[in-house]
Amino acid sequence: MNVRRQFLLSLLAASLFPHAGGAQGLPTDVRQAIGKFLDTTARKEVSVGRISIDSVAVEGNTLQLFANMNCAYIPFREDNVAEIYQGVSALLPAEFAKYKLQIRTNKRSIEELVPQALRSKKDKKTKTFSPVASKPLVTEVSSPYTPTNGLHNRHIALWQSHGWYYESKLDRWEWQRARIFQTVEDLYTQSYVLPFLVPMLENAGANVLLPRERDCQTAEVIVDNDGCLTGRSVYTENSGDKLWSQGEGQGFAHLRPQYIDFENPFKEGTYRAIETIKKGNASTAEWIPEIPSTGQYAVYVSYQTLPNSADDALYTVYHKGGTTQFKVNQQMGGGTWIYLGTFGFNAGRNNECKVVLSNLSSKVGRIITADAVKIGGGMGNIARRISNEGATENLKSSDTRNLQNTHTGNIQDRVTYSPLSTINYQLSNYPRFCEAARYWLQWAGIPDSVYSESNGKNDYTDDYKCRGIWVNYLSGGSAVNPTERGLNIPVNMAFAFHSDAGTTQNDSIIGTLGIYHTNAYNEKFANGASRYLSHDLTDLIQSNIVRDVRTLYEPQWTRRGKWNQSYYEARVPRVPTMLLELLSHQNFADMRYGLDPRFRFTVSRAIYKGMLQFLCSQYHMDYVVQPLPVDHMALHMTSENEVELTWQPVADALEPTAVAEKYIVYTRIGDGDFDNGVLVDGNSYRTTLPAGLSLIHISEPTRQA
């Protein structure tokens, strides 16, 4: 009887747990065969370590195979997912034929790792990261064209790796990375970001925000309502139906040539305010700079964001090419430098080179504020010395000790430290665009809890930490990041552009690595969307880079992994984020291509395409890529006072949507600057020459789709 009862209990146990028992019985040789099959599949695309099946389980009628993280580096697409399932199914013993197969890696099934942008069936029920801004931060009113299937009303935070910084343990300024192959990473990544990537994104309609100075111009002019520290620059006001008044609270003031521990120029002055009108006699504020020498200068404005701020403050920039107008949404971005554009200015002070702000608006009774205007990039003005509290260890971005002091979101200015003297403070003596983000953020009025988490003890760690925290400060108060205080800018994504270290003993290429992080903030963004969207972003950008480089330059270009790892820049931002390691700046085989400006253009365009694909997918939009530059340009005199420009479009074999339908032609006369352009339908343009003209320049047409 006891034997029979024991036998019945054994049968019951077997019936309760048949799947687990069968799963554990998957033979070792079958697991190894599946791993080898996945290895073979992966190495068609990616350089990856051995893939193995770590464990097996059954959920209902589903057989789950859990592969290690190397499997997650495969760029999964619907076609290769189907091939993988077909191939693995063929390797399973017959007794598993009744189960539905699911292969999992990186805590997801492999079909879930197909980026949403590349799925044939769009699941509109899945949460996307798609913040809605009624109006973007800055809109160029004078532009003859607004992209409709591009990046209009999108805000992108990005940065170009490291920069010149103060190393307190050596009491000197230095590069964060080594000099090699005629460059250093701190400058090398700028050769992609500033001349290529940022203009591509802006031409597609995006507002691009950088935590480093973007202007290579070493001169800088500050014009402010509180007076100018140097030169003969002038701030003036003209009152119409409404009067300017002193704003309540703090604003910018330029009180000293250099700034030290935690000093914030945006907390040392005042600002001006006025009510808006819809029609009538407008009031204006004017900033008239004294330009030190003729050249190109970036123009930044500043203001304060108030509860009733206008979302369409009208700025007009007078420059060598005429006038260009912008509408700035002052409901976001107050208390820092906001970039408008880069323009040509003549040396000296005159009414043809100035910035004007009007109180004309689409709505009556709102508030427009006016503070300082910054023209040019300038030289570094943040002075550093060893902290009274000493220095701390230079931890790597991926160091697990950084997890113990992840930024909490408590963004505020500390009480300013007043040293007994300024002896031993050192300026960088470098152009500001060379400096690390930590110093630009101080000059830009960002709270010191953002740019100096170490409280002044370690600029190395502060620099890489501040970039991610800065993203959260930009987005703080918006729907993207409603729980933190900040600038209310609905940032759509963040991107860190790095080059990597590492060498090979032969002519092998190190190649392209993507890094993202999901295991933070409960694996969700504020709107409930999954942080695995950062995986999608990483996959799309890496895939575009590798495909384009293999097609146009090097068929053996190495695709490295997609690391889901806790790098500070990837972990901290509360928006979809990718950290790119494009290539190894230490490896000759990589830098054979990396020093070629044509290669840099191709890579930057690939990054832009990946961003465009990702962002449009979040809004369930079709995307259109900006066409390639035109060629076969020719200029013909059609009569004594008329000239015709002709050109031919260039087909993009890598992108079927990049087809030119319209063009923008820019013109400059004599030694002036280019105008705002005119939109033309065909591939020719005629214009009448002004009387007495000595020289005319017509630029390569900007391509529009």
Each model region followed by its residue ranges:
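Active-site-adjacent mobile loop/cap segments within catalytic or ligand-binding domains
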Residues: 267, 353-354, 360, 372, ...
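A short beta-strand element within beta-rich, extracytoplasmic domains
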Residues: 283-307
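Pro/Thr/Ser/Gly-rich low-complexity, intrinsically disordered linker/stalk tracts
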Residues: 616-657, 703-705
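Residue-level detector of conserved catalytic or cofactor/ligand-binding positions
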Residues: 694-704
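Non-catalytic propeptide/linker segments at domain boundaries
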Residues: 65-174, 370, 374-385, 413-426, ...
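Active-site microenvironments of hydrolase-like enzyme catalytic domains
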Residues: 159, 428-535, 563-586
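Extracellular carbohydrate recognition and processing domains
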Residues: 320-349
